[in-house]
Swiss-Prot record:
This is DNA replication complex GINS protein PSF2. GO terms for cellular component: GINS complex. Residues 245-259 have a biased composition (Basic and acidic residues). GO terms for biological process: chromosome segregation; DNA replication; double-strand break repair via break-induced replication. Gene3D superfamilies: 1.20.58.1020, 3.40.5.50. It comes from the Eukaryota. The GINS complex plays an essential role in the initiation of DNA replication. Has a role in chromosome segregation. It comes from Coccidioides immitis (strain RS). The keyword Oxidoreductase does not apply. Residues 245-268 are annotated as: Disordered. Component of the GINS complex which is a heterotetramer of SLD5, PSF1, PSF2 and PSF3. It is found in: Nucleus. Belongs to the GINS2/PSF2 family. The gene is PSF2.
């Protein structure tokens, strides 16, 4: 017996997409560059930093060939400030803007040299290329970048933090404290997601404006998709049955009034 397909993207598929995020490593030994589908990687020369996809960085870390530098947001100071701001607001904090690079300085110049493009990247029709997750370089380390005024979390924050805490906890500062803050942030944001169920009724019937999901992470959307879509479908069916009952009552009332009119005409 075949089971029905899950609604939306599964957690394992979301984790797979997160593994394409770029992170910064410090190699322990020399390695030649690789020809990947996303483009070639630069040769690894210790102790020079390099940017690699997360899946490759985790593989080298397990083989003890490299150390992974934690992203700029994966530290106790940043996460504590984000936790406080998330607690003080009823809505999700906004993510970093897509048209504003989260890194400036050496990383940007190195990527420009590798790609051969000195100016901003363009699409085939000449428009400015604006990448989206997991192709936003929000998890690379750049010493020359300036910290943003307001804390934010990347789109794949939960998956990336979980994988780094499992595989590269020795490369993080105070990993136990980071794990605790991540758990607190996750609980607060899931509580906010559960509050959104009050909008599902109006959205399912058709009179609502939709669910505001700006700032929600990939794994959070994946976890809530099954419940939200199932609840919306149930409420839609309930609303349809109510409309059908009201329609039948209206039709029955019209028939009853027509019968009364016919009786009056016969008496005359």
């Amino acid at each position: 017996m075949a089971f029905p397909l899950p609604r939306g993207v599964t957690p394992s598929e979301i984790t797979f997409l997160c593994e394409m995020e770029m992170v910064t490593i410090v190699p322990r030994q020399r390695l030649e560059g690789l020809e990947l589908l996303g483009g070639p990687t630069e040769p690894l020369i210790p102790p020079r930093r390099s940017s690699l996809p997360l899946w490759l960085a985790l593989l080298l870390k397990r083989q003890r060939r490299a150390n992974i530098l934690p992203p700029p947001w994966l530290n106790t100071e940043w996460l504590s400030e984000f936790l406080k701001a998330e607690t003080d607001h009823d809505v999700f904090l906004p993510p970093p803007p897509l048209d504003c690079a989260s890194y400036t300085g050496s990383v940007a110049r190195r990527d420009a040299r590798r790609s051969g493009h000195s100016g901003p990247r363009r699409t085939l029709d000449g428009q400015r290329y604006i990448p989206s997750a997991p192709f936003l370089l929000q998890n690379v380390v750049d010493d020359e970048s300036t910290a943003p005024r307001n804390p934010w979390l990347p789109y794949h924050w939960l998956e990336l933090a979980t994988m780094l805490l499992e595989t590269a906890s020795d490369d993080l500062v105070e990993p136990d404290q980071i794990r605790r803050i991540i758990r607190d942030i996750r609980e607060i944001r899931m509580a906010k997601m559960r509050k959104f169920t009050e909008y599902v009724d109006a959205t399912a019937i058709g009179g609502g404006e939709g669910l505001p999901l700006t700032g929600v992470g990939a794994m959070e959307i994946g976890e809530a998709r099954g419940f939200m879509s199932g609840a919306a479908e149930t409420l839609r069916q309930i609303g349809a049955s109510k409309e059908e009952a009201l329609r039948e009552q209206a039709e029955a009332g019209d028939d009853l009034r027509n019968d009364y009119d016919e009786d009056d005409e016969m008496e005359l």
